[in-house]
């Protein structure tokens, strides 16, 4: 069992190290922002990518779009319809204002990686931080290729998986997102995460 786990970790590391190397080949100088677009497994994938970038000796920062949810009253999020989820779930204005825009400025400009704690239905006290001049920001979560965010990311990874989110509203919103935004077709890279321990790169022209 332990040898199987070690093999899985080695395979996972090789995949993420190769993915990090590709990103650094194209965006190793200056600030860059990478999207991990997915509703299931995106956070874990994003953190693995950050770890691989750091193994390569490159400064990186992780953020989740879920930490930029629109402020809601207790229990309100659970009552959201699929339309609510897609159209009003996330506070993209705050996401840009406190994270994307200052991160791109570089230098000593401070940025914030989380603004709202949905589980507690409260705003998060801003923690302003800085990063190295060549840092890469990895943002994980759903709907990242939607038209309103086009041009935000230098590199987008779209996660393909048969797994579906537990939330019915999110599941239905994903169908609308796929129809409206065509995330698979605008992604820089497509990754099959059917087996999260063995992610596999998929090339659109071979599907």
Predicted regions and their residues:
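Hydrophobic/aromatic beta-strand patches that form the interior of the parallel beta-sheet core
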Residues: 34, 61-63, 138, 155-157, ...
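Post-Walker A helix-loop "phosphate-sensing" segment adjacent to the P-loop in P-loop NTPases
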Residues: 51-62
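Switch II (G3) loop of P-loop NTPases
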Residues: 137-143
